[in-house]
């Protein structure tokens, strides 16, 4: 086993990378509130794992979506647990994200030279809220249906572009299969991909610039 490790070490310098990661200086003023971003990331990873598991059973059609969710909750092995963890983690992720944004703002973490870190963080906050909006509709029950109808109808008040924007969100003039398909695609592919991209921008900047000093 050591020979295998030595082979990789010789080519990739794994130990040097590990030392750089584990030897980063942590300021003495850091406390539990500085862990909120990491907790948000942990919730996101739980969401990815449990969401991926549910895609094996969920059917994104207006006729089968609700029945497939019922199947997950009542018949699939540990389906009730996986979906429950997904829901609890979603609520926790939103809460931790809000607290994290407040902590960064109140401690001045958005100031120079961390403006771009703040911007990417705000984008991640918007993406987190978008996860909630799109995921809420996927069971396609009465609550989900009317939530989608209300949310997608909001842009209609915008002059000129309101109606085309509503049709773009819904996929047609009314809420239906096209809407569910779009929300499912957003929730399971587009939003996770964008979140991963902005996280890959967000974390290296934190790593490079370090944690902001105390007030």
From Swiss-Prot:
Where heme c binds, per the record, is at 35
GO CC, one annotated term: chloroplast thylakoid membrane
Q: Does the keyword Cell cycle apply?
A: no
Subcellular location, record wording: Plastid, Chloroplast thylakoid membrane
Record's cofactor remark: Binds 2 heme b groups non-covalently with two histidine residues as axial ligands. Binds one heme group covalently by a single cysteine link with no axial amino acid ligand. This heme was named heme ci.
Q: Does the keyword Plastid apply?
A: yes
Query: Where does the UniProt annotation place the signal sequence?
Result: none
Alphabetically, the GO molecular function entries are:
electron transporter, transferring electrons within cytochrome b6/f complex of photosystem II activity; metal ion binding; oxidoreductase activity
Q: Which residues bind heme b 2?
A: 86, 187
Q: What is its main location?
A: plastid
* Annotated binding of heme b 1, by residue: 100, 202
Record keywords: Chloroplast, Electron transport, Heme, Iron, Membrane, Metal-binding, Photosynthesis, Plastid, Thylakoid, Transmembrane, Transmembrane helix, Transport
Q: How does it sit in the membrane?
A: Multi-pass membrane protein
Q: Which GO terms describe its biological process?
A: photosynthesis; respiratory electron transport chain
Q: Which cofactor does it need?
A: heme b; heme c
Give me the segments passing through the membrane. Answer: 32-52, 90-110, 116-136, 186-206
The record's InterPro entries line, in alphabetical order, gives: Cyt_b/b6_N (IPR005797), Cyt_B6_PetB (IPR023530), Cytb/b6-like_sf (IPR027387), Cytochrome_b_N_euk/bac (IPR048259), Di-haem_cyt_TM (IPR016174)
Other observations noted = Heme 1 (or BH or b566) is high-potential and absorbs at about 566 nm, and heme 2 (or BL or b562) is low-potential and absorbs at about 562 nm.
**Its biological function?**
Component of the cytochrome b6-f complex, which mediates electron transfer between photosystem II (PSII) and photosystem I (PSI), cyclic electron flow around PSI, and state transitions.
Question: Which family does the similarity line name?
Answer: Belongs to the cytochrome b family. PetB subfamily.
The protein's assembly and partners:
The 4 large subunits of the cytochrome b6-f complex are cytochrome b6, subunit IV (17 kDa polypeptide, PetD), cytochrome f and the Rieske protein, while the 4 small subunits are PetG, PetL, PetM and PetN. The complex functions as a dimer.
Name of the protein this chain belongs to:
Cytochrome b6
- Tell me the organism: Calycanthus floridus var. glaucus (Eastern sweetshrub)
- This chain is encoded by the gene named petB
